């Protein structure tokens, strides 16, 4: 059977918070079967836990943020969450000593490296998948996102940016999930933003950690980063990365196909909530024979670059 996974050892990394611009320390700890993904603020006394749950996502303005009833929050969880989904980690406690996960280079790649450094431990409990049984669609103006039954996990994503630096041919991506393809083709795509927006946010004491080191930055005509893009379709690829992270906020791998047009964190979260609220739209399932699995996770001990 495909088994649940956690980490073999405790790992830690330090980075800068996108919003505060301050140093943030992130610690990942192994967890027992059926613990799920738990985010924990350790700078508070007592510490505050946020289980991965679409209902905990209450702010999607500039990132995906978990907020509890007392207004305590952890921001910018989506790239780490995408890395957990990509590597197939079911059980982990994520400790952070700040109100946000460090932004690192603006992609999921540093988190994938961290998870691989910790090592993967398979647990003697079946991995629980959410299998989509019928289509569910959310619309917002001309934006939409839909998930439908599919024997695997596939994302068909289209963006629509009218910008000289973003070619029309590079605004659509179909991604068939496997750990190997996620790490190789998706995880390195960075977040992006416009210089005018960053300057405005920083004037409002926001996005203080934003820089060329953690994002693709554009003006009205071109990409301002000296090194340019990591690959031609990096913009839409990052949107796929975000969607992988946003959908994994249910704490389980999904068997289904997401199609989306101009979707972002808010629409992704609304879709996930709508699916889980409809008892006829999904079911729990396990995969007894790994040879029959429609999704391929990396083997424990294997390092993919």
From Swiss-Prot:
**A single Gene Ontology CC term:** membrane
Cofactor section: Zn(2+)
Q: Name the keywords, alphabetized.
A: Hydrolase, Lipid A biosynthesis, Lipid biosynthesis, Lipid metabolism, Metal-binding, Zinc
Query: What's an example GO BP annotation here?
Result: lipid A biosynthetic process
Could you tell me the EC number(s) of this protein? 3.5.1.108
Q: Could you tell me what this protein is called?
A: UDP-3-O-acyl-N-acetylglucosamine deacetylase
Q: Where is the active site?
A: 265
Q: Which GO molecular function annotations are given, in alphabetical order? A: metal ion binding; UDP-3-O-acyl-N-acetylglucosamine deacetylase activity
Q: In which pathway does it act?
A: Glycolipid biosynthesis; lipid IV(A) biosynthesis; lipid IV(A) from (3R)-3-hydroxytetradecanoyl-[acyl-carrier-protein] and UDP-N-acetyl-alpha-D-glucosamine: step 2/6
Q: Which family does it belong to?
A: Belongs to the LpxC family.
**Taxonomic path:** Bacteria, Pseudomonadati, Pseudomonadota, Gammaproteobacteria, Vibrionales
């Amino acid at each position: 059977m495909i088994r649940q996974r956690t980490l073999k050892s405790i790992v830690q990394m330090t980075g800068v918070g996108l919003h505060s611009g301050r140093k943030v320390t992130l610690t990942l700890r192994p967890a027992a079967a059926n613990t799920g993904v738990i985010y924990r603020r350790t700078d508070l006394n007592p510490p505050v836990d946020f289980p991965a749950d679409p209902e905990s996502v209450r702010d999607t303005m500039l990132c995906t943020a978990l907020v509890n009833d007392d207004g305590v929050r952890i921001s910018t969880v989506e790239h780490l969450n995408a890395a957990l989904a990509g590597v197939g980690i079911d059980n982990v406690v994520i400790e952070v000593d700040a109100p946000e996960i460090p932004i690192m280079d603006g992609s999921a790649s540093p988190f994938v490296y961290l998870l691989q450094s910790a090592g993967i431990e398979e647990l003697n409990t079946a991995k629980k998948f959410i299998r989509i049984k019928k289509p569910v669609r959310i619309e917002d103006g001309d934006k939409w996102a839909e998930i439908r039954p599919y024997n695997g996990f596939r994302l068909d994503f289209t963006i629509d940016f009218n910008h000289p630096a973003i070619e029309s041919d590079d605004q659509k991506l179909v991604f068939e999930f496997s750990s190997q393809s996620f790490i190789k083709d998706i995880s390195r795509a960075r977040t992006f933003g416009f210089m005018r927006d960053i300057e405005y946010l920083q004037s409002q004491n926001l996005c203080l950690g934003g820089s060329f080191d953690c994002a693709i930055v554009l003006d009205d005509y071109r990409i301002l980063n000296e090194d340019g893009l990591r690959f031609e379709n990096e913009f839409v690829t990052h949107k796929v990365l975000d969607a992988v992270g946003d959908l994994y906020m249910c704490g389980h791998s999904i068997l289904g196909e997401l199609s989306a047009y101009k979707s972002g964190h808010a629409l992704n979260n609304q879709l996930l909530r709508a699916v889980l609220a409809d008892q006829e739209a999904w079911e729990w399932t396990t995969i007894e024979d790994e040879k029959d699995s429609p999704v391929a996770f990396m083997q424990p001990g294997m390092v993919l670059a």
